[in-house]
Curated annotation (Swiss-Prot):
This is Probable transcriptional regulatory protein GOX1679. Keywords: Cytoplasm, DNA-binding, Transcription, Transcription regulation. SUPFAM superfamilies: YebC-like. GO terms for molecular function: DNA binding. It comes from Gluconobacter oxydans (strain 621H). InterPro entries: Integrase-like_N, TACO1_YebC-like_2nd/3rd_dom, TACO1_YebC_N, Transcrip_reg_TACO1-like, Transcrip_reg_TACO1-like_dom3, YebC-like. Belongs to the TACO1 family.
Amino acid sequence: MAGHSQFKNIMHRKGAQDAKRAKQFAKVLREITVATRSGLPDPTSNPRLRAAISMAREVNMPKDNVERAIKKASGAAGGDDYVEVRYEGYGPAGVAIIVEGLTDNRNRTAGEVRAAFSKHGGSLGETNSVSFMFQRLGVISYPLDVASEDEMLEAAIEAGADNAETTEEGHEVTCAMENFFAVRDALESRFGEPQSAKLDWRPENSVTLDEDKARSVMKLIDVLEDSDDIQAVYANFDIPDDVAEALAA
């Protein structure tokens, strides 16, 4: 029986991983669809599509899937018609939260997001109710072995970035939103394709959470991220190491 239980646990974890992978693929495919329809289906002349293809590589999406999505979005039918949406509000402990999505039904998505906030100790606010607490930045990441700290900083500044930080995890270049595509392309021409390149909301200040509040906030974020319509969730909280260890136990 123990072996059977262990097998069930392994299969449950594998099933959860497969479900997560499928959800990641679905979100990236939506971005590819919107990116393709926002410009030309050629990534060399469509910066947003190029970024979407980079996202697909990050989640190890097969190249065939990407090509089919581009072909479908650029065809006469055009695929599903998605619009970009953004929601802002507060979670437990006054944590500010920004939710970005791509949806084919604004009313459905707004209802789901509002219900998630209400059910999990938060409140959905108006547009721009919390975004002033964040900076909208381009973030480009590279592994350590592509350049030294000084080389990356010099290249980043020359490309028009605001800063480059190097840690044991790699190089991270940040730039103004309007310079994102130019900076990314300049760095790519010098160091090759980045590990990741995306627009991000970075909080000006963070709320430090205890274990109970951290569980509540993470539950809300998990529910939001589980929606097919939601592409990304950003929040201004910080979880101390000891609390993170307790949550992982």
